[in-house]
């Protein structure tokens, strides 16, 4: 399981941006027209215009949408190839129970108080192939995790109304809070914003909230990528995980993939 976290690398925003611009310049005809992003029900969820042919960086917001879309395509491939294979090997080798995940969730400062068992159970489901059930727990819990971090660093996570009542801000607003961006890895925030909440990205959180996502979709591509991304996220702040890595000669000398983790499934 720790080897799985070593194989996973959060992609840098700058690398995604350079890839989008590079592909646009190398294949201008293929990127001359916009495209409609369609969900599983055949509905158009977003009309994505093309980038400016003279200056792809002219509209930063539009460029960001293309970055989410480009990242999604790579995430689907990674999920369907190396992550699906790696998870299958894990299932064939082990039957994961909650105790095997203690090292990941116990005393992990990033997990909100009282949510350790929830994460533990969801990850057990995910690693044992119960993907549909796992996604329905992990997506809202990861959203709450980032809300909690934002609160801890002084970000305002609610909108105050004139009558004195308050309403929780939407996830995209939470992940864009200056306080959160100042204190947390922006590449990780970008990844989870695309996975959970962007129509140009995977939009997993909203598809789950509206009952759109299918059982099959939860067992493929970007959903597998999301599940492994959550494991990686938790491993970064797990003291036990750090100690295991520190004391294991095999894990200590593992070569972290520089660019594309697809090369590690041999």
Language-model features, listed with the residues they occupy:
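Generic recognition of stable, solvent-exposed alpha-helical segments in well-folded globular domains
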Residues: 81, 114-117, 129, 133-140, ...
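Short, mixed-charge amphipathic alpha-helical segments
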Residues: 110, 173-203
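Charge-enriched, short contiguous segments at helix-coil
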Residues: 191-257
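Eukaryote-specific, cytoplasm-facing alpha-helical/coiled-coil scaffolding segments in long proteins
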Residues: 148, 167-171, 233-238, 252-264
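Sequence termini and other peripheral, non-core segments
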Residues: 4-6, 262, 266
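The feature captures two recurrent sequence modes
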Residues: 1-69
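Charged alpha-helical initiation segments
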Residues: 49, 61-132, 254-263
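Secondary-structure-rich domain cores
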Residues: 92-178
């Amino acid at each position: 399981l720790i080897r799985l976290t070593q194989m996973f690398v959060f992609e840098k925003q700058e690398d995604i941006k350079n890839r989008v611009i590079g592909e646009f310049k190398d294949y201008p005809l293929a990127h001359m027209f916009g495209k409609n992003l369609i969900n599983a029900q055949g509905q158009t969820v977003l009309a994505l215009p093309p980038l400016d042919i003279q200056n792809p960086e002219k509209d930063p917001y539009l460029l960001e949408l293309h970055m989410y879309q480009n990242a999604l395509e790579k995430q689907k491939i990674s999920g369907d190839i190396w992550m699906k294979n790696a998870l299958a090997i894990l299932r064939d080798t082990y039957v994961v129970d909650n105790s095997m995940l203690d090292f990941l969730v116990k005393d992990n400062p990033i997990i909100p108080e009282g949510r350790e068992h929830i994460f533990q159970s969801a990850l057990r489901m995910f690693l044992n192939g119960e993907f549909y059930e796992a996604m329905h727990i992990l997506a809202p819990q990861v959203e709450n995790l980032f809300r909690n971090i934002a609160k801890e660093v002084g970000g305002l996570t609610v909108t105050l109304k004139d009558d004195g009542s308050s309403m929780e801000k939407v996830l995209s607003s939470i992940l864009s809070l200056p306080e959160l961006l100042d204190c947390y890895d922006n590449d990780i925030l970008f990844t989870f914003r695309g996975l959970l909440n962007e129509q140009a990205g995977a939009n997993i959180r909203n598809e789950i909230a509206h009952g759109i996502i299918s059982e099959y979709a939860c067992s493929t591509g970007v959903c597998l990528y999301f599940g492994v991304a959550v494991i990686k996220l938790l491993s970064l702040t797990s003291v036990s995980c750090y100690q295991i890595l520190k004391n294991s000669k095999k894990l200590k000398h593992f070569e972290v993939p520089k660019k594309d983790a697809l090369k590690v499934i041999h």
